[in-house]
Amino acid sequence: MRKILMTSLLVCLALVSLGAQNKWTATWATAVERPFSASDMPKTSLSNHSLRQIIHVSIGGKKLRLQLSNEMSEQPVEIKSVYIADAGKGEAIDASTVTYLTFNGSRSVTIEPGKAVYTDAAAYKLKPLQRLSVTIYYGQTPPKATTHRGSRTTSFLMEGESKPKAAFAAVEKFEHWYNIAALEVEAPASTRCIACLGNSITDGRGTTTDMQNRWTDVMAETLGGKVAVINLGIGGNSVVSGGISAPASERFNRDILSQQGVTDVIIFQGVNDIGGIKDDGARTSRMLTKFYRLFAKKCREKGIRVYGGTITPFKNSSYYSAVHEQVRQTVNQWIRTSEYYDGCIDFDKATSDPKDKEALREEWQADWLHPNAAGYKAMGEFAAKAFLEFQKE
């Protein structure tokens, strides 16, 4: 009897130990926001429609959960069902991989305004760097949904309930995400997870639709799908004020520190603050470095390593003047030399034209402010190399 009890105890301890070696870690995430204009919402109501959205994960896993958000809406959103599947071309899916997700055992849930919910944990063979399809069947929805405007990926909307084995008869297509906020996997406790704070250059303005080639995507691929890289960039966003959606100074806790499993943070934001300068720029320099210090302090308090990304060149764009350039140089010098950061990812140095360091390389620019796909590829590879060097220190 004593031997049986001892064996049972050892089994229980082994299971507890196994659980302690794992943690929920975000493999994909996005920064939720309110619609900025009418074009940020579908022409067709989401109510009583099925929405198929595609995401590109970084690390894989055998158990996952999805976070859905209604944080930016003023009315409840009714979710009748959600299923995931390996994504194919366009709206196609591999029907053999379809897995319905539940909420406390139920397929349906109503998310109150200002709230977010998790699905129950589900078994799923999620491969590193794969594309995953998320299909939501809605009941009643708010007229203005919680969104992420810059998905850089096509989403598909069809009338009524989508059946996994039936063709998805899309009535509308658009490049926005709605209600999906994060996908997490159960990963070893040693897993690194990099949360990237940024604006449209992180959000991927200038990338190729449906190619998942933001610099963060390239970074994840260069790291071989072994390190989680999550993109919390918002197009037009500022650190202090004046941009689109809540500034980084207000959203840092929610969008960065609340992500599960984060071990490292890259702060790569400030160009929109600089672009909006209408004086000598001294105050903007002070405010940017003030919040960089605050962000770094918050990360350090949670045991998170934090790196600063220098602001990339913008000569030949509407942001450029001698004053704006001087502020960029001042802020970048602070980023390169600050003791608040555990390291600097010198995107400025990586992307500037050797013949004119105030401008992007011509072959890497989309509009002289944003890189093109080749520029983002160079940035992602550069960031991955820098990250690996930081791990040696």
Question: Where do the protein language model's features map onto the residues?
Answer:
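Hydrophobic membrane-targeting alpha-helices
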Residues: 13-17
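Catalytic His-Asp segment of secreted/periplasmic serine-dependent ester chemistry enzymes
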Residues: 275, 312-393
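Surface-exposed amphipathic alpha-helices with a cationic face
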Residues: 292-300
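Conserved SGNH/GDSL esterase-like catalytic core that processes O-acyl groups on lipids
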Residues: 28, 47-53, 76, 80-85, ...
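N-terminal secretory targeting modules
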Residues: 2, 9, 19-197, 207-209, ...
